[in-house]
């Protein structure tokens, strides 16, 4: 049985708790991340080395489960989750582009990362929490990965930048910027001017 480890830190004044050694113990690693009542679970599994492959077979899937928000989708009889939404695809790509470059270029071992949203409180966004959980999960394996990755979401309102904004704060924000990096790996943003970005401070 894996030893339970709990780590808590603050980001933008909001407390984030990472827990490992509790669930999915057959995986290489599993990290549960909580911010408020938003909870995600990131699991990492890997297969034996396959030298015949000419690429790195990394697959990453971000899943927003319907039960996380207390929703039931579809007709009276169809209650299962459907194909990935645009949001799930975009978040999966964001996490993938943050994590993939930190593996060795010639690495050929198949790796699967699945991040499942278990609970959503309506205020704390699961997407950023998912990226943090995925980074922590990979970092706690024995895989040759040059992480961890830091992830932060930025909003902008009334001339001030908001670190780790809530859903309600983001609804009134002029900026939706996600930065994931060890130094600088990936930036994803919506609705901002170049002048606004140039004046931002990321210290």
Give residue ranges: language-model regions:
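Short strand-coil-strand connectors
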Residues: 10-14, 36, 157
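Short, ordered loop/turn segments at secondary-structure junctions
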Residues: 21-23, 38, 44-47, 65, ...
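Stable alpha-helical structural segments in soluble proteins, enriched in small hydrophobic residues
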Residues: 98, 129-141
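Mobile "lid/hinge" segments at catalytic clefts and subdomain interfaces of large enzymes
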Residues: 138, 142-203
């Amino acid at each position: 049985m894996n030893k339970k480890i709990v780590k808590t830190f603050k980001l933008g004044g909001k407390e984030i708790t990472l827990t490992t050694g509790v669930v999915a113990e057959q995986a290489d690693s599993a990290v549960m991340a909580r911010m408020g009542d938003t909870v995600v679970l990131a699991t990492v599994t890997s297969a034996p080395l396959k030298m015949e492959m000419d690429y790195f077979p990394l697959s990453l899937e971000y899943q927003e489960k319907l039960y996380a928000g207390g929703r039931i989708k579809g007709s009276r009889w169809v209650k299962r989750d459907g194909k990935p939404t645009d949001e799930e695809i975009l978040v999966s790509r964001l996490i993938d582009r943050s994590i993939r470059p930190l593996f060795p270029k010639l690495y050929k071992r198949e790796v699967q990362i699945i991040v499942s949203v278990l609970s959503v409180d309506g205020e704390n966004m699961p997407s950023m929490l998912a990226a943090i959980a995925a980074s922590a999960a990979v970092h706690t394996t024995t895989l040759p990965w040059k992480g961890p990755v830091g992830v932060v979401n930025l909003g902008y309102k009334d001339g001030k930048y908001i670190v780790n904004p809530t859903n309600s704060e983001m609804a009134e924000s002029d900026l939706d910027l996600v930065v994931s990096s060890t130094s600088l790996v990936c930036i994803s943003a919506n609705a901002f001017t170049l002048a606004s970005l140039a004046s931002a401070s990321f210290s």
